[in-house]
């Protein structure tokens, strides 16, 4: 029979009181439990299963469902939509919206194909979807290329159950339409405008067209062309021009923020992606000479981050006002991944990069409950044949905290892992750590839980364990650092950093509640939790009023059933450096 250890019963009834989230920093912590591979989807209106799921765009609708648009080939060929009622854990059968057809273009017999579907839900609930449509051969008939490429839109007034017929609104060689609606009702569509061709290659730039009537007309016309587009950005060098694949958000002050990749399909610049900003009054109505001479100049246009190189950027905005930029096919400090960077509320200083996996042609959006969803395209082999899938992950947002007096604490079995306000870690393994903070005149208090179905405990750091690095400013303005670790048997250590060595400051055992059997693989465990006070004199002395303490959380996970020789692996809170407490999140004492 499974043994239940209940060793911390007297005071285990409360969670550390945390006041309203301050307007400071945040980090994204990816959740291993939410990773999904979408390799195929039944197409319910056509009676077959689609096995290539590319170029995903996923957003939360007003009715609570998630909607995903996607395409089924690198260069098209058709657009689909699908819906989820369980936060992307499963997807209902897809609908193919438009079918590629045969016909004649300036190049003769040809195929009319579709690529790059993206959508928004308007303020009135209408879903507006746009895509590029082109004649496959006619696109490469360079003398007539602008006659053979279009943007079409479709809309749904019933949550995606039915759709209007496609309507052509734009003609001209182009790619990657994306849209944003402003509070005024204006809809902006951002386009990779490739109407100019030089050396048999596109010379792209980014333009915008506008609708003031819910998408019925654009640039005041039922049907506009590349000649009507308003230039936003173009990078020019001796080899040609660049800039494309735009998406945008509106910041709290009304300014608009838009990331771009800087390459032409062949050549690229050293700085990609870049971020473009316009104030509310200008609203992209900038100097149209940018088309000929390039621009805008710094600071209106700047590198997203000095350590990031990536493509196909996508942007979203959190309720806190912070923008997030996803870059696919990317490297951050030399490490490959689909990287998400956090900006400040002014749309600047992007950093604190995190990545759950590699991928390209992706999206990111806020989906509620302090969570974001990311989706990317990944290629793989299926019986030797190349296929493409969509991979998704949900990230939880860890906000800087204001910590007050300890409040009510709940036992692990009663802890709500979905809604709790704690910091979270759990990307690397099907195991999760939750941490919160409080304080009393005597101690800095850490409330912590670890959930794992196989609990192992040896020494504190060679266990399934919770770790917290603590940083406090000293008189010289530097940080003194401390390391606290506790496992399911209540064994803990507290170290003080001296130079490059950790020096033991305290150790022992503390009460914990462990639900399960430690080091027994014959059953399924739940995890452990506890409240862990660290006396102020052990970490530098009594705090100043309103002091900002820096904290960085760790997740130790033990993947072997033996104590050695293999030790526990450490998952660190991403987006910050363990050697620099200044980069860690704030815990402000109130």
Name each model-derived stretch.
Residues 294, 456-525:
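Extracellular/luminal beta-rich ligand-recognition
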Residues 50, 413-436:
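An N-terminal domain-cap segment
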Residues 7-15:
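Bacterial N-terminal signal peptides
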């Amino acid at each position: 029979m499974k043994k239940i250890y209940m060793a911390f019963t007297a005071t285990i009834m409360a969670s550390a009181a945390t006041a309203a989230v301050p307007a400071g920093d945040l980090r994204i912590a990816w959740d291993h439990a939410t990773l999904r591979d979408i390799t195929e989807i039944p197409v319910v209106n056509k009676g077959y299963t689609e096995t290539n799921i590319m170029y995903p765009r996923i957003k939360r609708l007003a009715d609570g469902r998630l909607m995903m648009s996607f395409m089924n080939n690198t260069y098209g060929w058709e657009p689909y939509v699908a819906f989820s009622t369980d936060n992307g854990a499963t997807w209902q059968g897809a609908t193919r919206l438009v079918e590629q057809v045969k016909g004649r273009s300036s190049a003769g017999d040809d195929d009319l194909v579709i690529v790059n579907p993206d959508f928004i839900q308007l303020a009135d609930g209408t879903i507006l979807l746009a895509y590029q449509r082109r004649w496959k051969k006619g696109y490469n008939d360079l003398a007539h290329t602008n006659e053979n490429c279009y943007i079409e839109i479709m809309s749904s007034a019933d949550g995606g159950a039915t759709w209007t017929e496609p309507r052509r609104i734009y003609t001209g060689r182009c790619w990657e339409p994306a849209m944003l609606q402003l509070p005024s009702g204006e809809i902006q569509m951002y386009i990779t405008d490739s109407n100019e061709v030089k050396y048999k290659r596109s010379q792209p730039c980014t333009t915008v067209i506008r609708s003031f009537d819910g998408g019925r007309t654009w640039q005041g016309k039922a049907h506009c062309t590349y000649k009507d587009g308003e230039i936003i950005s173009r990078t020019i060098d001796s080899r040609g021009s660049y800039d494309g694949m735009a998406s945008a958000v509106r910041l709290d002050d009304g300014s608009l923020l838009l990331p771009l990749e800087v390459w032409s399909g062949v050549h690229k610049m050293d700085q990609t992606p870049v971020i473009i900003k316009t104030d509310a009054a200008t609203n992209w109505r900038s100097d149209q000479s940018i088309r000929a001479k390039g621009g805008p100049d710094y600071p209106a246009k700047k590198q997203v981050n000095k350590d990031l190189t990536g493509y196909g950027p996508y942007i979203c905005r959190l309720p806190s006002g912070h923008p997030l930029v996803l870059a696919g096919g990317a490297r951050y400090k030399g490490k490959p991944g689909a990287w998400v960077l956090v900006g400040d509320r002014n749309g600047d200083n992007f950093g604190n990069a995190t990545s759950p996996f590699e991928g390209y042609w992706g999206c990111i959006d806020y989906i509620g409950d302090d969570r974001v969803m990311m989706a990317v395209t990944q290629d793989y082999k299926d019986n030797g044949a190349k296929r493409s899938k969509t991979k998704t992950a949900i990230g939880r947002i860890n906000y800087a905290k204001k910590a007050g007096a300890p409040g009510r604490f709940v036992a692990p079995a009663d802890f709500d892992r979905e809604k709790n306000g704690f910091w979270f870690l759990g990307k690397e393994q099907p195991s999760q750590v939750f941490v919160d903070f409080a304080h009393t005149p005597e101690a800095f208090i850490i409330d912590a839980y670890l959930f794992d179905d196989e609990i192992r405990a040896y020494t504190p750091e060679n266990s399934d364990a919770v770790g917290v690095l603590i940083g406090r400013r000293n008189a010289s303005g530097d940080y003194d650092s401390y390391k606290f670790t506790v496992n399911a048997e209540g064994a803990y250590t507290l170290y003080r950093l001296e130079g490059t060595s950790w020096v033991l400051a305290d150790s022992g055992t503390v009460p914990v509640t462990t639900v399960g059997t430690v080091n027994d693989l014959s059953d399924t465990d739940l995890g452990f939790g506890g409240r862990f006070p660290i006396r102020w004199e052990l970490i530098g002395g009594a705090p100043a009023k309103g002091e900002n303490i820096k904290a960085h959380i760790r997740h130790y996970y033990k993947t072997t059933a033996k104590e050695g020789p293999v030790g526990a692996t450490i998952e660190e809170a991403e987006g910050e450096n363990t050697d620099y407490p200044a980069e860690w999140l704030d815990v402000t004492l109130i």
